[in-house]
């Protein structure tokens, strides 16, 4: 029943409470409504009565004092898993469950033997790797030291991207390890795709229901109840509640003969109170190209004027495609679904081969998938193929110590030709082509605690970032410069040509001249017959790299995950082998120890 109808019917709520709920609903996104639903479900399970106080005062509810404890462990690389874990903790507390929230990096594996109920929330990093904070726990649970866990009930939820081969691999690993140790699953593992908010909220409700079946509760106690988004919005912006910032600058920083269009983006955060650290990312909520939306509906025989239901509202199909759905990048699920709808022999053959399906999906835009076989679809069928729109995360390329209430990005514009037609990336073309300077753009800061400068300013730093992977290192050097850090800085940068692709060249030369950067080594792959990349420069300076490592240097790598990061990793192993006189196995262990101690950090994509 709609909230606006409540006052007209018999209801346990008074008019003031109805007004509060109406306000909360009106100011909340679909994801926030899903969270609120789970939160109020938890309250309904308590034995104590609840009382909603005025929104202008801190709200409290009576919640049952539990007997027994639920431990929530999160393994998070960029913060998404942590966010889900925090929401679950709040819902569990409201439901009267004693709960402990802990990072996988702070959790001792041997403590599993003392637990009765555990929920583990895990993201996956790189190629099926556990997040940095979870490496030790991940290794412990598959080791001979792991205890048998016959008295443990557990649940696992994974966050990932189904476009990648090792989708939610860390969550799958934890699920498998706990099961082999004799623990009993409370419910089936959920593997969430990029649009995880709603399914994760539903799963949390089910998980808490299962936990409460065997976690008893006692007398009521008072716990805080933050009931509206607007109460939190005063001091904090987030993915669900982004800040409406202003685009100050979108400047092309590659030369006229470059095959790339890379933009330096400056965004005004004045008055927002938003803060960030070097290494964090900026989430950008973007809109799709209206022309692309119209082309897609035409491709499947629709006009775009059809009305569809989106979160309880009826809106035109083309409007939904512009603002609510991902319509640029294909994914394996979309290709699989369209293969079934279109009965395309080509797509059916691709679907039968997972590797070819993943390769095709990663290199093909949605409109080109739809063009594989002319197929009439209904508006509902088209929508069923699509993911919900999610924000694009960009590594921040500025330090607030340097730029104040601004945030800078370094954005590579995705643009290529498909036959006689042009194809563009959704977010990059929005920032570079469709958003005018002075226009509003919704943003939020995504913390990345796994890509941070060393706390000790005397520590040497080695930064390896070709192409737009240079972004966080611009922030790092600005930060170290403003802090007058004594530690040495060494930058490896690479791209196609010196003349047209040396991003921020003047700035690096200034830092080199002033002594902020002690060493700058570049690799321009197309300036000579033989291709040279950053990993080659690392090997050329193997002796010095090893010396810096012996001095305690931290190593950072940012950029392409599929090729560059692997090649740099192999180069570092070779340096350790040759200069440290170690076997390959010992070199791998050495590098793994660097990663565990936060001396080897990667921000790859």
From Swiss-Prot:
Listed EC numbers: 1.8.1.2
Residues reported in the UniProt entry to bind NADP(+): 525-526, 531-535, 567
Natural source organism: Photobacterium profundum (strain SS9)
GO cellular component: cytosol
Family per similarity comment: Belongs to the NADPH-dependent sulphite reductase flavoprotein subunit CysJ family.
Self-association and partners: Alpha(8)-beta(8). The alpha component is a flavoprotein, the beta component is a hemoprotein.
Residues that hold FAD according to the record: 328, 362, 392-395, 410-412, 425-428, 605
Catalyses which reaction(s): hydrogen sulfide + 3 NADP(+) + 3 H2O = sulfite + 3 NADPH + 4 H(+)
Function (record text): Component of the sulfite reductase complex that catalyzes the 6-electron reduction of sulfite to sulfide. This is one of several activities required for the biosynthesis of L-cysteine from sulfate. The flavoprotein component catalyzes the electron flow from NADPH -> FAD -> FMN to the hemoprotein component.
An example Gene Ontology biological process: hydrogen sulfide biosynthetic process
Pfam families listed in its UniProt record: FAD_binding_1 (PF00667), Flavodoxin_1 (PF00258), NAD_binding_1 (PF00175)
Cofactor needs: FAD; FMN
Top enzyme class: oxidoreductase
Gene Ontology MF, one: FMN binding
InterPro entries: CysJ (IPR010199), CysJ-like_FAD-binding (IPR003097), CysJ_Proteobact (IPR029758), FAD-bd_FR_type (IPR017927), Flavdoxin-like (IPR001094), Flavodoxin/NO_synth (IPR008254), Flavoprot_Pyr_Nucl_cyt_Rdtase (IPR001709), Flavoprotein-like_sf (IPR029039)
Cofactor note: Binds 1 FAD per subunit. Binds 1 FMN per subunit.
Name this polypeptide is given: Sulfite reductase [NADPH] flavoprotein alpha-component
Keyword Oxidoreductase: yes
NCBIfam families: cysJ (TIGR01931)
